[in-house]
Amino acid sequence: MKEEMLEVVNNNDVVIGLESRKTIHEKGLLHREIHIWFMTPNREIIFQHRAKDKDTYPDLLDATVGGHVEPGMSYEDTAIKEGEEETGVKINLSKLKLTKKLFKKSFDQVTGRTNNTIRSQYVYLFEGNAGDLRVEEGKAIGFEVWKIDSLRTLGEEDKKRFIAFIFSDEFLDLFEEGQKLLGLK
């Protein structure tokens, strides 16, 4: 299998090189990613349950869609591509809203890898049934729907099922902003 290559960027989001995904995560090199958080008209978020053998954050709940920006692609093009690959949904651009670009550096204690990214965070108004989403084989186990308002008050046992950064004020505020951008609040 051919090794996935990704662009390494500087703090100004300018490409400075090309490295393998493995090397990028082993060395904590800055690279580009996207997240899409599917939100429903009922003010819920649909989380993706990551596969147990993922190289970072295995078996945890994460953004509905996430992916690396491939060489030569834009963040938006990646969101469209990954959205369809990971959920089976053809992304309607009028329902996709950029909330912000974040610099995120996190260390996964389970795998010993560092994810150092500039990540475009999108919200997407999903008006379908979560049960109709297609799971990308090998990448995810399934999807779970959670009320956005419940995230601030989850108990510690429930929180262990998610990637920890989801409960930071930065992300809880992002979810609030996302609801406003989508006209849900």
Features from the language model and the residues they span:
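A residue-level structural signature of the nucleotidyltransferase/glycosyltransferase Rossmann-like core
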Residues: 6, 44-45, 143
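Nudix hydrolase/Nudix homology domain
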Residues: 22, 71, 100-105, 109, ...
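Conserved Nudix-box catalytic region and its N-terminal flanking loop in Nudix hydrolases
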Residues: 23-34, 44-81, 85
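Short strand-connecting beta-turns/loops that link adjacent beta-strands
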Residues: 41-42, 138
